[in-house]
Amino acid sequence: MTRLCGIIIAAVLAAGSAHAVELDPKAVVYTLPENIKWVVNERAGNAQAVIAGDPTKPGLYVVLTKWLAGNHFSRPHFHPNDRFITVIKGTWWVGSGANFDPANSTVPLPAGSIVTHYGKQVHYDGAKDEDAVLLIVGDGPATSTPFVAGMELPKK
């Protein structure tokens, strides 16, 4: 029995010490979920955290976008460039075209779904009854142009 207790204590101590390892910051940098710096846009019902690059400037960018639960949706809009999206958590609801009807014209995309928003194509998106966290990769600047009825889309 004493030997068994010793083995259990040794295993617990070994497991605890595994978390004390320090990584070389020249090789690996990480941010724990509780330390992600979200910028909340209450009016839009979402929050964003920049992971890499600067989405307001030309070049590659990576952002996390969190659509907040409560039936928050963007209005129909388009972006100048393609965007590549992975649903990390929750269910993200996506619609295409100028007819804004989140209740009847959106597709639920669960965590693990991969989506491409093609540049200069009208879509809208958001969350219904749960938060949806997305990882978005694109080529900046990441502007969003609202679609207005009768508007002619720019050519690709």
Regions found by a protein language model. Give the residues of each.
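N-terminal secretory signal peptides that target proteins for export/translocation
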Residues: 1-2
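Bacterial N-terminal signal peptides
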Residues: 5-16
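A short, N-terminal "cap"/entry segment at the start of jelly-roll beta-barrel domains
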Residues: 19-61, 149-156
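Double-stranded beta-helix
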Residues: 27-29, 122-156
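Short acidic-glycine-tyrosine-enriched beta hairpin
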Residues: 43, 56, 98-120
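Conserved short histidine dyad/triad with adjacent acidic residue
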Residues: 61-79, 118-120
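Glycine- and acidic-residue-biased ligand/ion/polar-headgroup-sensing regions
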Residues: 68-71, 78-100
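Short beta-strand His + acidic residue motifs that chelate non-heme Fe in jelly-roll/DSBH
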Residues: 74-76, 94-95, 117, 122-128
